[in-house]
Amino acid sequence: MHWSEKIAKDIIKRSPDKEEYVCAAGISPSGSIHIGNFRDIATSYFVYKALIKQGKKARLLFSWDEFDRFRKVPVNVKEIAPELENEIGKPYVDVKDPYGCCSSYAEHFEKEFEASLSRFGVEVDFRRQSENYRSGKYAKYIIQAVQKRKEIFDILDKFRQQVATEEEREAYYPVSIYCPVCGKDETTIISSSEDGVTCEYTCTVSYTHLRAHETDQYLV
């Protein structure tokens, strides 16, 4: 028995009454997808196919984490677009395409990977996280995270080796903010409203001191 069939059987045994089983994978479009990234979707794909083989309705969901921070310029990209160093800190979806053929850095490498999957005959339900964030789909969850930030800190602190200070606990926020002035996440939240709807923050790049509301598109 293939390992994916065993996992599929275990899933069905655990949740036998599901109308549809959803297998999920996801990565950031940080550059050309290598074999390590491909393993993530391949694992979910084999389980998805095993579920279908056993007569179950299943779907393969793939999340493009394109609202993640652009952390570094890959060596092969730096050779043709060294100026992208200036865009580190922005979400991938807001970084320009170094090859000039797509609307963004994210779209370029997403299309490259999606074309490869298509050649292999892999059918995927793609989701783009920038659309979910900017549509406000996650707003209520972000508010909850801000409201319960100290509880979240306490949970994480249980797994730390060093003792946390009360100052660290007080300053902790489980969210990041992309500055609407410079577009980067070089921000520090300094306070929030009691209901978690508004955060006050500063940006080290644009030297701004602003407030972010839960409906804003740059809260993540």
Predicted segment positions?
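N-terminal Rossmann-like or analogous alpha/beta NTP/dinucleotide-binding catalytic cores
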Residues: 1-152
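Short metal-coordination and nucleic-acid-contact micro-motifs, chiefly zinc-binding Cys/His arrays
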Residues: 172-175, 197-199
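Short cysteine-rich clusters marking metal-coordination/redox-active sites
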Residues: 179-182, 203
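Cys/His-rich microdomains that often coordinate metals
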Residues: 186, 207
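Conserved small/polar residues in nucleotide/adenosyl-binding loops
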Residues: 208-215
